[in-house]
Amino acid sequence: IQFKELTNVPKYHEDATVWEVTEKDGTHLGVLYMDFHPRESKRGGAWMTSYRSQKTVDGKRDAPVISIVCNFTKPSANAPALLTFDEVSTFFHEFGHALHGLLSNVTYRSLAGTSVPRDFVELPSQIMENWAAEPEVLNMYAKHYKTGEVIPEALVNKLKKAGTFDQGFITTEYLAASLLDLEYHSQTKDITVDANAFEKAAMKKIGLIESIIPRYRSTYFNHIFSGGYSSGYYSYIWSGVLDTDAFEAFKTTTLFNPEKAKLFRENVLERGGTEDPMVLYKRFRGAEPSIEPLLRKRGLDKKTEPLKKVKG
């Protein structure tokens, strides 16, 4: 796909830029607004918004209008805007959501783009983050802004090691919170409970050691009570299983494999919520996702000796 900046269309703020997105042959796909810098009255964080979702009317594709909004530091008079690696990953992430909206090709607007089950919506965004960290891709953008020197290999290796740091703890506390969420939402009767006692019993049930607690305790677990993740907090790590397994299709061939990219586009990005997510995924990948790529990415695939008690 190709991007061409549009200068003759309305913008909600002067900081925003507007781009027409087309196929290689020039066929119109949609319009993308990009709004990268913080300002007064703009909330923090980063997100993708669909101003107009795609639909098909009388056989004609009604193109979407999508935006990516971030809060990257503005360039100064003497230097461009320099991004941290986390900020780069954020952009790749939101760009994945944008592609999901821009490449949608369905009949009904209510099923377009990111209108999919919550535990599937992060696949297009999270898979993009994998490319951001690949040495082949880093060499394209991670350069010294004055000299043009490409990021040193030693620094790339440190970046890779940092990605697995403390993942045992991080994964365990997350899974504990996910299982606590499911325990709360698996109750079949109206009951009054002591939140701390309920949580303690739930953690004992799964065998969580006392030195690790759930990422969110019951008394401030907003995600599952008012944040839209009721019985769905697990979706973050499930999306991790999906995105790492999906990325293997490229990692084991070439990072820019056009055949695999075409399969991903036609069976995931274009289809929105028109079919069961696992049906779409298997059509792309040829099989159900494996957990092994996620374990490798987190450095948790290595077999280790069990801890032994120390006398004394």
What are these model-predicted stretches?
Residues 1-312:
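Cation-handling catalytic/transport regions enriched in His/Asp/Glu
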